[in-house]
Amino acid sequence: HMDHGEGMFHSKVQPTWVTPHPTDSKVYVTGNASHEIIEVDTNAWKITNRFKTAGKAPYNTDISSDGSRMVITLKGEGKTEIKNLKTGKSKLVNNTTKVSHGVVISPDNKFAFISVEGIGGEPGKLDVVDIRKAKLVSSIEVGKQAGGIALWKIEE
């Protein structure tokens, strides 16, 4: 038995997700507990920027294929943040329930698909957000524990 006299250590950042930039040598780390996104230059492996999110507990992120916008789920608020990576400005969209989880952007960069967990016995949902308008445009129930989400392009 080893007792070092210390309790369990919890990171002040509590990273939950890493998203690579589609055109630059950068990755973005989601700091759930620190309410921030951390930009890392992958050529030098150094932090090059840290920016606070517009709400609490960012969880997952995705970046548009042109690298201009980042969509961030704010699990602590039941909202989605759409951030313009060039200007730094953000817009918030309310999700249909309180526990926003996964996010993926459509290949045409028009929509963000957000998996939203149900609470208790409630079904989870898939919210669809128009990225340019920063507006919820559709939602559908998908069953319990709607967690992550992914899209892929099928070519003929």
Enumerate the predicted regions with their spans.
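Predominantly soluble domains enriched in secretory-pathway, periplasmic, or organellar proteins
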Residues: 1-156
